[in-house]
Amino acid sequence: MRQFSYVLLLGFVLAFIAFQARTGIFRRKNPGEPANKYMRQMMESPQLSEDDAAILMQKYPTAHSNPSGLRYVVRAPGEGAPVPAGAELTVHYTGAFLSTGAKFDSSYDRGQPYTFRVGAGTVIKGWDEAFATMRRGEKRTLIIPYWLAYGETGRGTIPPRASLVFEVELVDYH
């Protein structure tokens, strides 16, 4: 009789566990996501390819790095106050691919500077972030990772996940 009660108790326990699992009480809210916060952040934060990271360390070892992933080297300091929010900027630039160094665009070649409003979202995120801290006349080399440039899809002649290098000059703002 005693053995029968153990088997009966074990049966009830297994039935209870099966019922709980079936109703979803023990299910995670997001089963496809990692369980801990650190793993989730690592999966969500974009990373440079190994090739791009190697080129970056070789060509730009002294580049300043922002938390967003934007890197820059100040080539010539500017004068005056930093760009105010919402200012209209006049800039010259030459854009190239980090991976190959091939130039894809240049306002210098056209002989006409480019004008845009900082922070309005009309240019790539890396430009909005970089130009917001520059001063009139300043020249920088911007190393912009793909997630601050044209992203996972690319655009026009820019392929997907392309990290870019810009030689920029803040000519004026108002």
Predicted regions and their residues:
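Cross-family detector of peptidyl-prolyl cis-trans isomerase
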Residues: 1-174
